[in-house]
Amino acid sequence: MLLRNILHIPETHAHFLMPVLQSSGGHQVSMQNTILWNLFIQSIDKLLLYLMTCPQRALWGVTMVQLIAMIYKDQHVNTLQKLLNLWFEASLSESSEDNESNTSPPKKGSGDSSPMLTSDPTSDSSDNGSNGGGSSGKKEGCDERRQALREGTEATLQEVSRKGHDYQNAMARVTADKPDISEVASDSFEVPCSPQQHLNTEEAMDDIDYEEQVQEYEQEAAAVSSEPLNLSQPANNVNYTTNAVYASTTATETQTTSSLCAMTSLCYEPFKPPAPLPTRRNTLSEMLSDNYTSHSHVSAVKLGQKSSHAGQLQLTKGKCCPQKRECPSSQSELSDCGYATQVENPESISTSSNDDDGPQGKPQHQKPPCNTKPRNKQRTLMSPQDKKELRRKKLVKRSKSSLINMKGLVQHTPTNYDISNLLKEFTVDFLLKGYNYLVEELLKQLLTSAKVLIDTSHFFWLVTFFLKLAAQLELDMEHIDSILTYDVLSYLTYEGVSLCEQLELNAQQEGSDLQPYLRRMHLVVTAIREFLQTIETYNKVSHLSEDDRLRLHQLQLQIGATTDLRCLFVLLLRRFNPRIHSKQYLQDLVVTNHILMLILDSAAKLEGGQTIGLSEHISQFATLEVMHYYGILLEDFDNNGEFVNDCIFTMMHHIGGDLGQIGVLFQPIILKTYSR
């Protein structure tokens, strides 16, 4: 409860000055980020997962949900989705090369690996993914993972202390003198491999050599040498400068072969910048001497902001890939626990990393290579089915792993990107090991503990926020089998009707605050949307067992027979009020109703399914008032997205075509959009 209350404290407008950067004029740091960073360094994630799964979890289940909500209050689901996509894409490239020729274990004494890892703590011994066998095997596997989690929790604090000490010694060795090229290169082989690392030999193929990093650093210095450096600029500006410079070097990274040949005599040939200037010094030695002298501190700040491991570039062979600043996602309404409903289409829940507005390339928070073997084979193309299978095996490894995850370094200034990567790691572990237990416990207390005051919005948010990520990862059903149940859907339906009634009563009273009811109402709709969307996603998953498919089959039949769920959206659309409800809420209503119609249509075709009169049900939407609300949403046709517009046109098509009630569509707000 103390941690929950601390994280609930709002940020002040005063600048929080890190002691390390006091000499440079100050650096604005989020106190929330600093607290989270320090908590995860002390392995708060291990403790939380243990408390969620221990037999006494009922005593603090509600408080645990509130703490999780506070941890994620500044995180957007879009950001985590993109980071998880990159995490998967990086592992796919490694696995495809491992399948070609890698049969030898990594060298134990290799110095290319960092002692601080944040991703993929998997063991090759658990590579055989299960297809969801018997229930006894699942129970034994859960017990083994729980025991491994407890053992990992006990050993983590000692490991953190030791590795933090090693990091400080390594940083002192690097920054003691002005390093030349040979010294920096030698430093990259002085850190021993951690015994917990099981890194594949071929991973070095995905990272450029150190000489290419010198070339990138050289181009960065050339780009910024023509303008004065502002050491007191905010963190965002420094990070933006770094991103812009690295984005300009993308073309040079693609010419690996020619770059390696040219770098053999780089120290003796003049450096040629992209736009030569007569007054610019053009030798590598001059550039390195100037930049290590005058810009060493700024470079350290930039590297610290790009990665959770400050100084990692000096110690290991890492990849400095170009980063694009993410566009801020649109927010509509915020819940009590900080969840922001996003304007998204179901297509955005794809597991491919094709988004243009996210960070590209291999993320900095992935594990570095542990091998200097040159690339000798071209990467084989993988089918989508093979990619899904490799990703599934990666998650199976992660769920069975008892290795220690190092989430960061002690002396580091965390940025928002660092915290997002930190929570990406915790999200994977949470979904695999704690999410199922937490939702099950909270629902039990909501249904039985009438005397305990529980904010229902936390339950709605848990379903909305994390079920989207679980569907993206395509977790095995055993990890979400307590969420995808008819009891959960029935409770959401009941709360939807109850909140609609409470909102109507309070709206009639002058001076009453409607925001809590509007937030909960919106979260109920999005929770049902994610529930139904997850069913649609898992119907297309190929690795489900027969028991899991039978469970999904039964759930769809139950949804088809539930008239209250269908009538809920008729009620909510008819009671929509443009004066108090947002357009985002209307969009979520229309999209969720469309997904429900698809499930009802497919449920009627299943074996044992009841005949559902969809035409009779759709006729309840064929009113001037409801179609006027559809017209309000259609006004923003250009920005809605393809799926949202498809939901609108499908309903209008059935009303005007199948039902023949075209008169309800003859409204100025609809005709005006069609006439454009």
From Swiss-Prot:
Pfam families the record matches: TIMELESS
Q: Where is this region: Disordered?
A: 94-145, 346-398
Highest taxon, organism lineage: Eukaryota
Task: Read off the InterPro entries from this record.
Answer: Timeless (IPR044998), Timeless_N (IPR006906)
Low complexity compositional bias, start-end: 101-129, 360-369
Q: Please give an example of a GO cellular component term from this record.
A: replication fork protection complex
Where's it found, cell-wise? Nucleus; Cytoplasm, Perinuclear region
Q: Where can the motif Nuclear localization signal be found?
A: 388-398
The Gene Ontology terms for molecular function here are: DNA binding
Where it mainly occurs, coarsely classed, is nucleus
Domain-level remarks: Contains a 32 AA domain highly conserved between species. Deletion of this domain leads to long-period phenotype and arrhythmia.
Subunit structure of this chain's protein: Forms a heterodimer with period (PER); the complex then translocates into the nucleus.
- Family according to the record: Belongs to the timeless family.
Listed name of the protein = Protein timeless
